[in-house]
Amino acid sequence: MDYKDTLLLPTTKFEMRGNLINNEPIRYASWDEKKIYEKMKKNRKNAQSFTLHDGPPYANGHTHIGHALNKILKDIIVKHNYFSGKSVRFTPGWDCHGLPIEQQVEKKLGGKQKKELLEKAKIRELCRAHAAEFVDIQREEFKKLGVIADWENPYVTMDFKFEANIYRTLCNVAKKGLLIERSKPVFWSWAERTALAEAEVEYEDKEDYSIFIAFELSDEAKAKLSINSKAALVIWTTTPWTIPANTGISLNPEEEYILTTTGYIVAKKLLSSLNESKILSGDIAQTFKAKEFENLLALNPLNGRTSRIVLGEHVLVENGTGCVHTAPGHGEDDYRIGLVYDLEVVMPVDETGCYDETIVRDGLIPNAEDFLGRHIFKSNEDLITLMGESVVHVSKFKHSYPHCWRSHTPLIFRATKQWFISVDEKPSGSDKTLRDIALSEVEKTLFFPETGRNRLKSMVANRPDWCISRQRDWGVPIAFFRVKATGEVLLDEKVLNFTAMVFEMHGSDAWYSMPTEQLLYPGAGYSADELEKVTDILDVWFDSGSTWYSVLKSRNYDAGEFQADLYVEGSDQHRGWFQSSMFLSAAVEHKAPYKGVLTHGFTVDEKGEKMSKSKGNVVAPETVLKEYGSEILRLWVASSDYQGDLKISQSILKQSAENYRKLRNTFRIMLANINDLHALTPYEKMGELDKWILNEAKSVFDGVHKSFSNYNFVNGMSLLNNFIVNELSGIYIDITKDSLYCDAKDDARRTSSQSAMALIVKSLLTLIAPILTYTADEIVEYLPEVIRESKEDIFDFVHKNIDVAESGFNTDYMYAAREKFYEIVDGLKKEKIIKNTLELVIVTESKKIAEMDKTAAEDWFVVSGISHSEVIAELGKFEVDGSIFVIQKATAAKCPRCWKYQAKDETATCTRCSKVLNA
């Protein structure tokens, strides 16, 4: 007789294959239709809040795998907090101003020259259209990743109200007394003709001259030092093109300097290394303290101009000569020491990186007309030649040098009139400097990982004043009026408020398209003719750095609370968004804009190499979605250690897909097993094995939830996978098959196991829902009503872990016994003595086994019997805590229905199966 139809085999309509590629877009469309984000807000009304403030991606180009990593990670974090019962806010945003968009518009127009023929207002119109196009494109690409956010109300930095709030933040910084305008050397991109902030600087290798130049001491200086022979300070530089602008030579105030027998002056500590490298030769003729040189003069060998000798703490004696060429127009340290000694700031380089008329007017270079309009980098060789024998040594070398992040051309330091936020001034209302406020707030902030704290602290501690002005077209203008007669900038509050109101109504384009009469507050006290507009625009990092004000503090968005609970970005944002946001919030609010900062690494290929089209190792999100679906990408994010760089490749994605398949099939078998469950068995009536798995699940799920709450997803996923593979699938689902398939439908043992599985499904479902949201939502449709409880979708659930089940099950003892049993079983199978464990029985005097329900003990080992009778034919034995377990073949016949060896003969069913069949 075929007993298959009498078995309660698992059944469910939940598919083995997710068909993610086709099903995900359909499910997301249904979420859109149901306005799931709004539903999430309603479901957690009055609950504890959680605000993730989105760092805005740039509205230029399609999203790449780094964008996908970032947005998925944010989405997982937000959803974890949601399913933990919190009221979450996740308002996505876009950075819309700045150089990259301008460059794209230039390309469309056919180059810079054609762009320069257009009015600024027209250029800005084209930039605005370009950014708007990619906001829409990227929004759809992010939604395809399963990200749920306030997509209908994103923040876009070029929106009129947003631009007005960026401007208001600028005005607030000015009111705090931190905004200054001054001529100061800044990173300058001659290719893009604009100043850059530190965050816009990248370092690449560059070949440069290494040149040692002798500056003769003036006769007066030699007389004061009692030197009767040739004497020249030797400076070392890698930028010969800055020698025309030299006005000083800096020495270390704590060092001794020597005059060599060959007539050169260098730091005493460096003489031996200079001699060894054959840059100099000679012995010590005289020794001096640095202080003796202060304010004496040397002569520039290029143009004969005097160069004042000054003392500066910035001078190091680890390499070079200890005598530092100082050109205040071309370096931050040079500028600072120049302020102390009132050195002239000479700036002979124009915005394109070419020498201007200053070299002719001030006689900075012999035959200056030959250099006029010539690019500085093309002038080095000729300048070296002009200095003749004063060049002591010259060579070439490669070193790391600052480059423009967009054009990848080498930058220069160039003194120009710019707007700065002073980080070492005290904002009005504070007794601390802006830098000190920021450093103090860094200490109060949570960091994930903790190493981020020192990284941000170091950057805050060492950064110079923030240059916030740019000489470009597309950005929020530094919309101040300047009085023509005096140069004074109008910072009257009513004037500033009026300008902000105009921007809110017409956008910041109004600064360029509207006449001064319409932009000026009527009671300003000046006529339009008496004023001129400041034409610089704001650094785009100011835009994004002020989003805490425009998004969290304004009433324009339902975006959560200030301070945000978390900022999440790549590790490069310590020098970017984390820092710019900190300084602006510290300036205006005197505190950080965030309570926590999470940083992740970058995406690399499986060899750890950076992705590039030339290498052919780029993994595009679109490609992954077409081949696997977003759930596989989301599982990859959650299973990767984001603290370092994240490897991704076809083979890694295949492994992620395999892990997804295992997880899905674990849910499928449990759903199939609980398909006919109508009531949950109370804990006190559950079997020992069911209590055991519930306690194991509770312990693991607690650990997973704790890891997820600390944003340690890789650890949480590891705990979860180990539990699913080992305890859940490896043991429990296997040992309950007999009861679930062969017992009567409503048998207490069967419904107990079903109840345990149902509770695990429900808790596990909300645990993985933040990561595999599509799958979790699909599973809800196949839950028995006893745990679905009429809920519409996954978003109606809140994570609640399983309760502790009071149990006498000795886990360590039973694990040890099972492990030793299966070691022997493996040998028996290899020797073909048995095919499966149901052919076996165990004979033991173990008290712990005797205390267990006999059937539960049999199920634990998946054997046909456990007894205390005499051993008939021993196949193997093992010992646990002094108790002997003997394995032997079952003597009863195999039941044709359940396959246990408990029947009287092979034609009859066992007692249990007979009862079920007769019922």
UniProtKB/Swiss-Prot annotation:
Disulfide bonds: none annotated. The keyword Membrane does not apply. CDD domains: Anticodon_Ia_Ile_BEm, IleRS_core. Its cofactor is Zn(2+). A motif ('HIGH' region) lies at residues 57-67. It holds the Pfam family tRNA-synt_1. Its EC number is 6.1.1.5. ATP binds at K613. Zn(2+) binds at C895, C898, C910, C913. IleRS has two distinct active sites: one for aminoacylation and one for editing. The misactivated valine is translocated from the active site to the editing site, which sterically excludes the correctly activated isoleucine. The single editing site contains two valyl binding pockets, one specific for each substrate (Val-AMP or Val-tRNA(Ile)). This is Isoleucine--tRNA ligase.
